[in-house]
Amino acid sequence: MMTAAWSDILHEWCARLITRHPGIRWAMTWCPSVASVASGTGTLLLFRRGIEYFPWFVGYLLLLWLSAVVLAHSRRALAARGRRVVGLVVDYTVQTLTHGLLLFLLPIYYASTTLTSRNVSFLVLLAAAALLTTIDPWYRRTIARFQWVELFLFGFGLFASLNVAFPLLRVRSSWGLHLSGFLSVLALTPVFRRPGIPWRNAILRVGVCSISTAILLWPVRDWIPPVPLRLARATLAKDVTDLEPDLPISQISAADLREWGTLACFTAVDAPAGLREPIYHVWRRNGAVVARVALSPIRGGRLGGFRTYSRKLDLGEGPAFWSVDVLTAHDQLIGRVFLTVTP
């Protein structure tokens, strides 16, 4: 009784204060957004150097995130007990953690995205999720109201972070992609468990969803940037000497190309220390694949990227548009190089 009385008095006092000072309502609406931007920017600045330390950051943040997921699952109980303030604190904590992680991931995925390819869609989705968690009114209207949207955002953020962390732990990207999908769903087990449902049933349901997610990621793998791999340098050239391109070009006449008789594609792929990853050069002429060249596996840790190249001798006649895709062993696009052959 005493608690309820104090709660009513506090609610009435807050209502009067907001009525007398309209600016307080505006501050209550937008201050969480400003705080989210500030915390996310601080996280980004703090970890902008030394991506190798990212797994420690992810481990810390995932611990907080999973705690927030468990708390978010108890919101109904908190609301039933009249502890609305506690529920709001839980919501804000989850929103802030989500925003901080997504904002930190954005530049990492941007560096690995080829803007002229389909994997830019994943970057757009990541940016949209970060924007939704930044603007508090949007978050309340589009995410907090619908639990399935909130769950998707949790799972998406977990997947995006684990997809970066596994290669840094020297896990091949082909394995890391599926492990990320599996664990990102498995981590939501506390949310899938409803009152009256045994843990065994919840784990079984989540296990099926986790395995399904890992399998479904295979056909859409080329829509996902191969983080943290990125193309540090890339060019087509007359030749490569001592792992440096000779006469790099982006355009050449058909006569000059005929005189050269060969083209070389030089690429330098930046990768974290300790990672070994097979890569391929896929040559295309006017959109048609004319060669797929397996290269030496890249070894991460070199400043400026691991350098490698491939050559093409049969160049055809006349004007053409050449492109070379740099792919991982399971066809994720690291980058793309173009060359225009003029008449």
Locate the predicted segments by residue:
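Aromatic sugar-binding surface patches on proteins
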Residues: 300-312
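Short acidic/polar inter-strand loop motif in beta-rich domains
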Residues: 327-337
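Short edge beta-strand/loop segments characteristic of extracellular beta-sandwich folds
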Residues: 264-271
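Solvent-exposed serine/threonine-rich low-complexity stretches and specific carbohydrate-binding patches
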Residues: 291-301
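Membrane-anchoring hydrophobic segments
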Residues: 1-135
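Short, compositionally biased P/S/T/A/G/V-rich stretches that sit at domain boundaries
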Residues: 216-258, 340-343
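Membrane-embedded alpha-helical segments of integral membrane proteins
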Residues: 147-194
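Internal/C-terminal transmembrane anchor helices
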Residues: 197-227
